[in-house]
Amino acid sequence: MHEQVYCLAISKDGIKWTRPKLGLVEFEGSKDNNIILTEKDPVLGYICHNFSPFLDVNPKVSAEARYKAVGGGPLFPLVSADGIQWKKATEKPIITKGAFDSQNLAFWDSVRSEYRAYHREFRNGRDIMTETSDSFTSSWTKPVFLEYTPDRGGELYTNQIMPYERAPHIFIGFPTRYEDRGLTPSTRHLPQWKYRQKRRALSLREGTDVTEGHFMSS
């Protein structure tokens, strides 16, 4: 396996995608690729595993910080003018409570005029926490777990939460539900069982777990 990398793909319609040749990062002897960041980067390499950029629609956003993200573990604020060249906005982490080796995302809430972030933490299994800030680079509130009606319905891994474009006062989410019952009589009937056995040799749960997409709103 090669090191983790973060790549850029471009689309005009969200259906057909292209991989621009950026010439930024050497990979297997060539810079003829669409990589913007690799985990070997001495400054930002640690964010490759959990990096989820967003376009900041805050009307007061500066040109050099049009794109933002939270990444690392604990989470640091990152900014970019073009979504390609990134830098840390501060040397101090902004969110420290959580399990950050998964999707960590943030966005500008135009209705409440604040930034909101979502990340994973454990509460009877994997769950989702949220916090807010009016500045992005500091003053984040204490994270709290989401509340569900009627209930969570199992462990939730990634969250994919965002404002609904046509009604930004409504948030929608597409979380990944995670389930692992271990090795049972039915496990061998899961898809790609031979491949799962190979993964299980390195990580037991990766040979037996299953996931599915959910939809939720608030």
What role is predicted for each listed range?
Residues 1-157, 163-218:
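Beta-rich carbohydrate-recognition and catalytic domains
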